[in-house]
């Protein structure tokens, strides 16, 4: 990626981590349909690889604004996709895709981070990977840790995530009939792919 700054990419990862970690509340629902978010989406669409994914997400958000009981329905979608059995779901854990759940713990230790006691999910949850990537991108912009060290850790994290993210996104597309989380997972997939190629 060329036009987005490290801080902007960090913000996208942090935002996606939040949306994949718990159901949206009324405030978040209002915020994603706001003019401020529309400006943010315009910025993201200035990156050609992200354009189609952002357009689809905006379409799903527009559909949300006219969906009856939008918050409750979206909460049901979240629950069905991410909290049920893996039969017809897209579980957001590396271990659900036969990946090493200890890898993220090693990466967190290397980054000097640990999981929050407020987040009652296993460490191999998708949101933890995204928070780590957000932290690393913010660190790149700060210049306090050598960029080579941060970049090496970023690449390791992206590689570990890429081992299972495509299957997770495919399952979101398969089982999310409304399509909000399918669109969100597609944006994440493209973002991670671009980030991974930007060595």
Swiss-Prot record:
Keyword rRNA-binding found? no
Looking up PANTHER family in the UniProt record yields: CHAPERONE PROTEIN TORD, CHAPERONE PROTEIN YCDY
- Name the gene for this chain: torD
What sections of the sequence does the record tag as coiled-coil?
none
Q: Per its database record, what is this protein's job?
A: Involved in the biogenesis of TorA. Acts on TorA before the insertion of the molybdenum cofactor and, as a result, probably favors a conformation of the apoenzyme that is competent for acquiring the cofactor.
Note the superkingdom of the native organism.
Answer: Bacteria
Descriptive protein name: Chaperone protein TorD
One Gene Ontology CC term in the entry: cytoplasm
Q: Where in the cell is it found?
A: Cytoplasm
């Amino acid at each position: 990626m060329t036009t987005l700054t490290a801080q902007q990419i960090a913000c996208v990862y942090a935002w996606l981590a939040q949306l994949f970690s718990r159901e949206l509340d009324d405030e978040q629902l209002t915020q994603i349909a706001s003019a401020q978010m529309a400006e943010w989406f315009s910025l993201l669409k200035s990156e050609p690889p992200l354009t189609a994914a952002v357009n689809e997400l905006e379409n799903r958000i527009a559909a949300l604004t006219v969906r009856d009981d939008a918050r409750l329905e979206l909460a049901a979608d979240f629950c069905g996709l991410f909290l049920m059995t893996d039969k017809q779901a897209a579980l957001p854990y590396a271990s659900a895709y036969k990946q090493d759940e200890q890898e993220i713990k090693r990466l967190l230790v290397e980054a000097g981070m640990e999981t929050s006691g407020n987040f009652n999910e296993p460490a191999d949850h998708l949101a933890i990977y995204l928070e780590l990537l957000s932290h690393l991108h913010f660190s790149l912009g700060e210049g306090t840790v050598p960029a080579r060290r941060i970049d090496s850790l970023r690449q390791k994290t992206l590689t570990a995530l890429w081992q299972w993210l495509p299957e997770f996104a495919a399952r979101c597309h398969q089982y999310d009939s409304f399509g909000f989380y399918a669109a969100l997972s597609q944006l994440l997939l493209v973002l991670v792919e671009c980030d991974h190629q930007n060595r």
